[in-house]
Amino acid sequence: VEVLYWNRDRKEENLNRYDSRIRFHEFSDYMQDSAPYARKLFHFYRYRSQALKLLKTGGFDFVIVLHTLPGILVSDYLLKNFAGRYIFDYRDSSFEHISFFGKRVMQLSLASKLTFVSSDAFRRFLPSSGVPVITSHNILEDSLNHRDDRIHAFKASPKIRIAFWGFIRHADHNKKIIDRLGKDSRFELHYYGRKQAVAKQLETYAKTNGADNVFFHGEYNPEDRYRFACCTDIIHNSYWDNNTRFAMGNKYYDSVIFRIPQLTMPGTYMGERCTAKGTGIALNPDSSDYADSIWEWFKSLDRIQFEKNCDADLDAILLEYNAGKDMLNNLFNAQAK
């Protein structure tokens, strides 16, 4: 097995934790996540060059394409040389509204052996027939081993602590949330994630506006989420742009695994799903009663019913997740024969 990965932070990676039979190929090229797409084009071109070189010289029997954009960047070569011999893992929507991009996504899916989607809302961009499309959830399996940590180590607070963890982006949307919740003594708003441009901008914005109940904690490791869960009352899972409207983010799963209510945005797939499943609420920070609505909803929450809802949603998610794993195992076992 050979893996090409993009080290966008140019930080040293601890590869010793992986199986020694895996050979890693590093593409080291610094690029900020929040950089404009026009500025990213040069980096994409360099990545394409390295990926093509590996595909042409590796003698591979099968390819797994993780995420949409890497697949698009080498789509011409995949369609010509690996049709029926690759898995297309579709995890982000971006430029599907552009005719060429949308058609190429369709072609990549149709020529794949299997296509996986991380959100059922992404199916609108894929063919409705011709290739199996399987829902593959972004669950970190180790999280399941820590599901009850919060029961034993929960730290209560008189304030409602709303926490975001992950890649901090969408400055304007988060400024609205800070405007609504900052300086409101009923709440604390916590951000965990790398302090790149948007995070620094939001931190400065909160300080400038005297929102001393808004905190930025910086970079963290995945396992730190178990600690965050023990001091969080609501997960901030609110996004708003065309690329995230249809996504199922990691925090959705953290919400149902750790049984923490989630705050989402109306008009998003996660907002629709969490309200339908009874695991969260969808509210728009443009609303003047945003803070009051959060307070009233949280204080009236039926905790017993909420936890049952989380358990039921997690059971449904794991059923699909394990079915996808079984399908992969069957495919690779057949390839090995």
Annotate each language-model stretch with its function.
Residues 116, 152-172, 177-179, 189-190:
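Conserved donor-binding/catalytic core segment of Leloir-type glycosyltransferases
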Residues 190-193, 200-227:
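Nucleotide-activated donor-binding/catalytic signature segment of Leloir-type glycosyltransferases, i.e.
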Residues 45-56, 72-73, 77, 81, ...:
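Membrane-proximal helix-turn-helix segments that form the acceptor-binding/catalytic region
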Residues 285-291, 298-336:
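A charged, aromatic-enriched C-terminal amphipathic alpha-helix characteristic of glycosyltransferases
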Residues 172, 223-230, 235-257, 263-272:
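Nucleotide-sugar-dependent
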Residues 65-71:
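Short His-centered aromatic/hydrophobic patch
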